[in-house]
């Protein structure tokens, strides 16, 4: 090579470079760097370089990616090694040199194509491969389209693998620990392998394109991999499928077929896995939960619900459904394809693939556009706007199939829109990013804007039908927002007759189990009353919900929906409340700090609130930096109203803030989880 000049070895200095590029948690052996930021390599020549001065004038590096690298589409770049560097293009400059070695600083463009690269040395036209590296997006670089200026946010939305996903109801938000695992080496490889389905490699430097492709492909993989409930036969299968530990095993299953299948009730899995892949490739991302969300409306701002005379759900609206909660993925980037005002958080909105165009199966909607009601900006903007701004209309279904509009308390969509707080393990309410305050002048202006657009282009409005009546009756339902299993609870219904006429009222109170997506799981209990309300009077009806009414019939991962239907001479009245189930609490006691390589003890306890024993109990513990592999322990049965306590020992391996997750499975419950964080410090040096 080069008239005798050859390379003895090349050191990519992976450990040092990865630390400087915030990728050291991915690997210390392979080179992972972020675009727009220099990295250093060392070349060691086979002979003193001063004897090959003519050849040295023609030294260049070649960086290439993809199956067929080409200068024409930007997948191959050739750049000379000099004492000067161009920070806006591929460049290399010699930082240090001696007789037989060079230390070279290589800089990539801030808009370079991401992916796996080969780096070659070219001397006098002859080429030699130096090795491979992986190039990622760079939120630390101001010139990168994914630049995020806040360091705490970069750590949370890019580097933090210990996530929380928020489930439950708007009045009882429940945190679910989630291991994103975006810094696992094979997770990044799997994310990049997904991209290879897309032939437009030249667009892999554009985070908008990359996010849309990944969103569409992950949605397709999810639909192929999710198992329907009917296929789940045994307790063991159900236990396996209900695991919600993290994204990595699910992604491996989706992409390679070697991993964990997914139970169809876990719709938040897609949002979590998408968040993992985006973070792994360098795009800041987070999982967002919307409580009470209108889904499947096609942009319509009305959702119809149907209940029978006993207040129990009766049929569904083909045009939409009210979900108790819905999860999505937000990612952070500039939008050069739109106006600058739409830079920032974008909502990944995948849908069913129609035809062969992958990009059409996933939209990327600016959060700002949703807040301002710009529903025509992108194809999915109207759907997302409707999901948090729709109105719900409740219809009473007669035995003969007739429908009657009810006077129902307004169900507000888009409540307590939540994501993990940057500074702590709790939820942050980001509703103000999506909506102006309820009843504000700004909200009114936005709704009027959308109303005008829909009347012009869709020939329909956004406001529900009027339910005013000359013979009113008011109905108020009072119940707790959550219910602990094993406990009875008092509920009450208040009826108010504001008229000068006596009323005969038929009151039906019903209890149902609902899945998070608004699908009826089971009808559990009902009670009927016939009441006489005097003119201008109020009456309170109290009753008890006994755990025996629902405890044995409650499906896994469901909620309680309490309803009240009051029928009288005029418009029926309806009220409802969703109640979250509080399963047995898995308590963890452990020190807040621990020493690396020293045994740490965690005390785990659980109380059985039921009248039957908890049997076949298995406790599992896992946590990056704390436990090398997941450990499982079979423990004693927990008798009714008794408490189980057990000690678990492990040795922390990594310094820093680490999370221990504890999970318990038994015959009555799957996936009872809790977590604690511990600060692991380096061992004290001997005096």
Curated annotation (Swiss-Prot):
Disulphide-bridged cysteine pairs: none
Subcellular location per the Swiss-Prot or TrEMBL entry: Cell membrane; Cytoplasm, Cytoskeleton
Tell me the segments the record calls region Band 3 binding.
31-39
Which Pfam families would you find in this protein's record?
A: Transglut_C, Transglut_core, Transglut_N
| Topology relative to the membrane | Peripheral membrane protein
* Entries under SMART domains matching the protein: TGc (SM00460)
Q: Which PROSITE patterns match?
A: TRANSGLUTAMINASES (PS00547)
Q: Which InterPro entries match?
A: Ig-like_fold (IPR013783), Ig_E-set (IPR014756), Papain-like_cys_pep_sf (IPR038765), Transglutaminase (IPR050779), Transglutaminase-like (IPR002931), Transglutaminase-like_sf (IPR036985), Transglutaminase_animal (IPR023608), Transglutaminase_AS (IPR013808)
What the entry lists under SUPFAM superfamilies is as follows: Cysteine proteinases (SSF54001), E set domains (SSF81296), Transglutaminase, two C-terminal domains (SSF49309)
- In the record, Phosphoserine modifications are located at 247
Example GO biological process term?
erythrocyte maturation
* Lipidated residues (N-myristoyl glycine): 2
Under the heading Gene3D superfamilies, the entry gives: Immunoglobulins (2.60.40.10), Transglutaminase-like (3.90.260.10)
One GO term of the cellular component aspect?
cytoskeleton
One molecular function GO term is: protein-glutamine gamma-glutamyltransferase activity
Q: Which keywords accompany this UniProt record?
A: Cell membrane, Cell shape, Cytoplasm, Cytoskeleton, Erythrocyte maturation, Lipoprotein, Membrane, Myristate, Phosphoprotein
Please give the family membership noted in the entry.
Belongs to the transglutaminase superfamily. Transglutaminase family.
Describe the subunit structure.
Component of the ankyrin-1 complex in the erythrocyte, composed of ANK1, RHCE, RHAG, SLC4A1, EPB42, GYPA, GYPB and AQP1. Interacts with SLC4A1 (via the cytoplasmic domain); this interaction is mediated by the SLC4A1 Band 3-I dimer. Interacts with ANK1 (via ANK 1-13 repeats). Interacts with AQP1 (via the C-terminal).
Other comment:
The substitution of an Ala for a Cys in the active site may be responsible for the lack of transglutaminase activity of band 4.2.
Function per UniProt = Component of the ankyrin-1 complex, a multiprotein complex involved in the stability and shape of the erythrocyte membrane.
Protein name listed in UniProt: Protein 4.2
Species name: Bos taurus
Gene this protein is translated from: EPB42
């Amino acid at each position: 090579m080069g008239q005798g000049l050859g390379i003895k070895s090349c050191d990519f200095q992976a450990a040092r470079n990865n630390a400087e590029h915030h990728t050291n948690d991915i690997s210390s052996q392979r080179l992972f760097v972020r675009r727009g930021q220099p990295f250093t390599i060392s070349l060691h020549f086979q002979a003193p370089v001063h004897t090959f001065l003519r050849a040295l004038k023609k030294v260049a590096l070649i960086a290439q990616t993809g199956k067929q690298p080409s200068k024409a589409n930007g997948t191959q770049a050739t750049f000379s090694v000099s004492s000067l560097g161009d920070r806006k293009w591929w460049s290399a400059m010699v930082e240090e040199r001696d007789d037989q070695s060079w230390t070279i600083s290589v800089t990539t463009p801030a808009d370079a194509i991401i992916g796996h690269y080969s780096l070659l040395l070219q001397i006098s036209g002859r080429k030699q491969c130096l090795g491979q590296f992986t190039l990622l997006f760079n939120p630390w670089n101001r010139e990168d389209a994914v630049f995020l200026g806040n360091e705490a946010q970069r750590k949370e939305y890019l580097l933090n693998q210990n996530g929380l996903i928020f489930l439950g109801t708007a009045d009882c938000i429940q945190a679910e620990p989630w291991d994103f695992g975006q810094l696992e080496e094979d997770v990044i490889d799997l994310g990049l392998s997904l991209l290879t389905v897309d032939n437009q490699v030249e667009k892999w430097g554009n985070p908008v394109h990359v996010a849309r492709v990944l969103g569409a492909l992950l949605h397709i993989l999810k639909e192929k991999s999710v198992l329907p409930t009917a296929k789940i036969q045994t307790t063991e299968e159900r236990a396996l499928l209900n695991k919600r530990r993290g994204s990595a095993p699910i992604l491996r299953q989706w992409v390679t077929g070697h991993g964990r299948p997914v139970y169809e009730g876990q719709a938040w899995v897609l949002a979590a896995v998408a968040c993992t892949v985006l973070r792994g490739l360098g795009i800041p991302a987070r999982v967002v939960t919307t409580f009470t969300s209108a889904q499947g409306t096609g942009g319509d701002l009305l959702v119809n619900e149907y209940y029978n005379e006993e207040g129990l759900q009766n049929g569904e609206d083909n045009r939409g459904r009210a979900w108790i909660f819905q999860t999505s993925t937000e990612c952070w980037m500039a939008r050069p394809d739109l106006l600058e005002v739409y830079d920032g958080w974008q909502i990944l909105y995948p849908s069913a693939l129609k035809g062969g165009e992958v990009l059409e199966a996933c939209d990327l909607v600016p959060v700002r556009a949703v807040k301002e009601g710009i529903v025509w900006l992108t194809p999915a903007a109207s759907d997302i706007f409707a999901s948090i701004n729709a109105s719900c209309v409740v219809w009473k279904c007669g035995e003969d199939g007739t429908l009657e509009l009810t006077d129902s308390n307004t169900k507000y969509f888009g409540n307590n829109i939540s994501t993990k707080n940057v500074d702590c393990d709790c939820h942050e309410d980001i509703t103000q990013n999506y909506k102006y305050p309820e009843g504000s002048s700004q909200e009114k202006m936005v709704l009027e804007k959308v109303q005008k657009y829909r009347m012009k282009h869709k020939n329909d409005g956004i406001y529900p039908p009027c339910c005013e009546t000359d013979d009113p009756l008011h109905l108020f339902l009072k119940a707790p927002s959550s219910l602990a299993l094993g406990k009875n609870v008092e509920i009450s219904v208040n009826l108010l007759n504001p008229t000068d006429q006596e009323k005969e009222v038929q009151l039906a109170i019903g209890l149902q189990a609902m899945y998070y997506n608004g699908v009826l799981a089971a009808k559990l209990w009902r009670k009927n009353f016939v009441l006489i309300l005097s003119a201008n009077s109020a009456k309170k009806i109290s009753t008890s919900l006994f755990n025996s009414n629902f405890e044995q019939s409650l499906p896994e991962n469901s909620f309680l929906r309490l309803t009240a239907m009051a029928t009288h001479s005029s418009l029926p009245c309806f009220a409802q409340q969703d109640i979250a189930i509080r399963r047995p609490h898995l308590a963890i006691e452990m020190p807040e700090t621990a020493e690396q390589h020293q045994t740490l003890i965690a005390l785990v306890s659980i109380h059985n609130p039921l009248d039957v024993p908890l049997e076949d109990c298995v406790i599992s513990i896992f946590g990056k930096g704390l436990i090398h592999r997941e450990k499982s322990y079979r423990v004693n049965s927990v008798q009714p109203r008794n408490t189980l306590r057990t000690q678990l020992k492990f040795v922390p391996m990594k310094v820093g803030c680490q999370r221990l997750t504890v999970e318990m499975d038994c015959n009555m419950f799957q996936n009872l989880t809790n977590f604690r964080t511990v600060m692991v410090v380096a061992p004290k040096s001997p005096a």
